[in-house]
Amino acid sequence: MGTSSSSSGLVKAKSETLAEALKSSSLDFSNGDGSSHGSKQHVRARTLSSPSYSSNSKNRWNTHIRKAKSAHPALDLAGLTGGAALSRASSASLGLSFSFTGFTVPHEEIIASERCSNDDILEDIEAATSSVVKFQAEPTFPIYLKFIDITYKVTTKGMTSSSEKSILNGISGSAYPGELLALMGPSGSGKTTLLNALGGRFNQQNIGGSVSYNDKPYSKHLKTRIGFVTQDDVLFPHLTVKETLTYTALLRLPKTLTEQEKEQRAASVIQELGLERCQDTMIGGSFVRGVSGGERKRVCIGNEIMTNPSLLLLDEPTSSLDSTTALKIVQMLHCIAKAGKTIVTTIHQPSSRLFHRFDKLVVLSRGSLLYFGKASEAMSYFSSIGCSPLLAMNPAEFLLDLVNGNMNDISVPSALKEKMKIIRLELYVRNVKCDVETQYLEEAYKTQIAVMEKMKLMAPVPLDEEVKLMITCPKREWGLSWWEQYCLLSLRGIKERRHDYFSWLRVTQVLSTAIILGLLWWQSDITSQRPTRSGLLFFIAVFWGFFPVFTAIFTFPQERAMLSKERESNMYRLSAYFVARTTSDLPLDLILPVLFLVVVYFMAGLRLRAESFFLSVLTVFLCIVAAQGLGLAIGASLMDLKKATTLASVTVMTFMLAGGYFVKKVPFFIAWIRFMSFNYHTYKLLVKVQYEEIMESVNGEEIESGLKEVSALVAMIIGYRLVAYFSLRRMKLHSST
């Protein structure tokens, strides 16, 4: 009893404190306060002045404002218990929060929220007060998303024949501004495929049915109005949260904004998403400790809402998150939707609190549509067709059990029971697979509400024709010039990879190799009739040809997901990224070779002339850049690390054998291999630098001017990189089959 009374007193005290805060806050938003009233008028005027809003939108906006003025009931907590008082206070706080953004919670939902437990209310208040108030009603171009009879098939090729597999079978639905649509179903039901189709990430020729945005088909111009958050968190692990969002703002926001305004926008997104505490923490990854999973997901969402998209698509935003973090993510999405955006998300198995945040629901099973409508009416619909839970359970859990055929705790119609008995007998006797539950639910949906929902989808969206045409506006210009993109991407690349270049493992590898070589060729005699230094020079050519190839191979395959994501959002020009990626590391590429040559050069007693030393450094540098080009070309062409490593091993071994040290005369029909070998040209240049004016030939190779070798290395540097660049141009950003 003591514990209960103390808990009730604590809850009531919190309720009274919250009520006082709300009372003082309501004074700030009252009509009598000129400053706050002016602020609201400023927001209203700014929104109404936006060309994105029609006269109908203005009327709706005025309606929301009128609702907002009456959305704050008097907080009379006298005579209430602790739980009831806290429930009343939380309802008022939610009403205040949504009215501040221009949207209000219906009175029925406020009353219903009082039935929640005290723990649920406390957690909802924390989520609401930490995120809802922060999202302001900023002008957003409205997008009314409709999809009717969506079908999608893939062709699977076998050894002798090919067959088509149906992934989506006539899916229909809609999502309008201010709504959160959830795509729910078991694994393999087609949720991600449908989301990709809605985001225009498939070749439109492979999709049946129609997807419309304000009654207009998809076009590339829509890329700037659609945000897409993938299931995997694609981020650079060594950048901080603040750096990640700042680079996104600088690259994606229009050039009409100054650099300071873009940085302020990034700071406001950090604040809106509640990332202030971790903004200076690295993102982290598999081998780098960083932010938590929920914070990483919020950073991904922040990258997409940075440009104020009208349509936001999210693939499993709550996967691998605990229930509390998942609730905060969905609460945040709910608030973003109420700010006038259209939100569509896939979700696997939400909790009951998450489920009640959804405005609309699509239930899929094996690519078939089992339900589309309001999420709040889903249980009523399935009860109407004879399927209802025997126990009190989470609605999402009930729906997933139903579509998966788990009928232990579910009441089903007798007709379905009879069919299930027959199917089980066939499964036992003939080993035949048939989803009788899916067939029954699909037929029930088609006969009950599918026709009515399609008729609703046929109605035109409530927008003026002028506003509809704005969705096909000319393609947005780049946020930065080519040179500015190059500089920014170079700086980002150096910050991201600075940890790899100077890792203790790489420095130890280079220094230990240099010391071993210096000891083996300790103070060798350059005037000897048998030049032993040629072996050292050849090894230097091989080492600095082998090392960069297998480092560069990983460049584009590892960054493929990031490159695809950023190119999908028109973040930068591919040419600016490629040049920045291949040139920003060049200063860093000089540090380890210089350190290597300083150790080897003086320990082995190579030619002690400043000119010879710097020419040796330049020769090794040309070899490194040429070898990197080969690695980049192989990696970009194959985009498969196993295949790329195998091909690179064979190529480097061939170049080494044809490098002029092991084989003096190569048969004429494969002599061209020698001229493609950067090892051969590097070795000849190093021999020239060390033995010029001392010997006319070394190991049977005449010492020439070196112009031919330098020209060959420069040609390789340019040629290999061109191959890599055009391979990236050909790279598919997403599956189109």
From Swiss-Prot:
GO terms for molecular function: ABC-type transporter activity; ATP binding; ATP hydrolysis activity; ATPase-coupled transmembrane transporter activity. The chain crosses the membrane at residues 502-522, 536-556, 586-606, 614-634, 653-673, 706-726. The keyword Nucleotide-binding applies. It is a multi-pass membrane protein. Belongs to the ABC transporter superfamily. ABCG family. Eye pigment precursor importer (TC 3.A.1.204) subfamily. GO terms for biological process: transmembrane transport. GO terms for cellular component: membrane. This is ABC transporter G family member 27.
